[in-house]
Regions:
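Short beta-strands and strand-loop turn motifs
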Residues: 62-64, 179-185, 213
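Conserved N-terminal alpha-helix of the aminotransferase class I/II PLP-enzyme fold
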Residues: 52-101, 110
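PLP-dependent aminotransferase-class I/II
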Residues: 128-200
Length: 213
């Protein structure tokens, strides 16, 4: 008996009917190419991380404990250099003190925006948790962007979920410093934005205001 038939018989002995086995095996066969693509992406990313670790000379010394003050903290500096290389960024901030996505976005927005600047969202409302950070609630917590003189402008998507390019163009002003694009739909009924659609939106905005972040 070949391996395939032996496997099928083993499932039958376990109470799985031949019809169920054939159905599941057929799905697995049809998904084989897709799983192979996923494995290739995983392998590519693994090589990318390994090369970044080699470039930044990750060693056992990077895992030594530090005083807690950050003096000569080789491990932390090396980890951030690895992240920057992997994501092709100028630099990276990788700290356990950043506890969630809203926390990370708050740090980024606060670092890049200054009084008089404007933040633009061309895809409608951001996450509820960001409203307090931006300052769009009726009662905002201390330290919101609004409190520091940073304005906010928003352009909603069209009813069919597409970008309102005309209104986005009109919303880009001289003091528009940063554009935030939320890919996830969050709690809104709109579809999640694909990478391709986000790229299209970024290209459009950059063609109008190249210096915007």
């Amino acid at each position: 008996m070949d391996t395939m038939n032996l496997l099928k018989k083993s499932y039958m002995d376990a109470g799985i009917s031949p019809e169920v086995y054939d159905y599941c095996h057929g799905i697995s066969s049809r998904m084989k190419d897709r799983f192979a693509q996923i494995d290739q992406v995983a392998e590519l990313n693994q090589i990318k991380v390994l090369r970044a670790m080699q470039k930044n000379r990750v060693s056992a010394a990077c895992f030594e404990s530090s005083t807690g003050y950050g003096y000569d903290d080789l491990g932390r500096e090396t980890l951030e250099a690895v992240y920057a290389d992997v994501f092709r960024a100028e630099s990276a901030l990788v700290r356990p003190q950043l506890t969630c996505g809203t926390h990370a976005l708050t740090v980024a927005l606060s670092a890049m925006l200054r009084p008089g600047d404007e933040l633009l969202s061309p895809v409608g409302r951001p996450y509820d948790t960001l409203e307090g950070v931006i300052g769009t609630r009726e009662v905002n917590p201390p330290g919101s962007l609004k409190e520091f003189g940073i304005s906010y402008r928003q352009v909603d998507l069209l009813p069919d979920g597409s970008f309102d390019f005309e209104r986005i163009k009109a919303a880009l002003r001289d003091n528009t410093k940063l554009v935030t694009i939320q890919r996830s739909k969050g709690y809104d009924p709109r579809p999640t934005l694909s990478v391709e659609r986000i790229g299209e939106l970024i290209a459009f905005i950059k063609s109008i205001k190249p210096d915007v972040i």
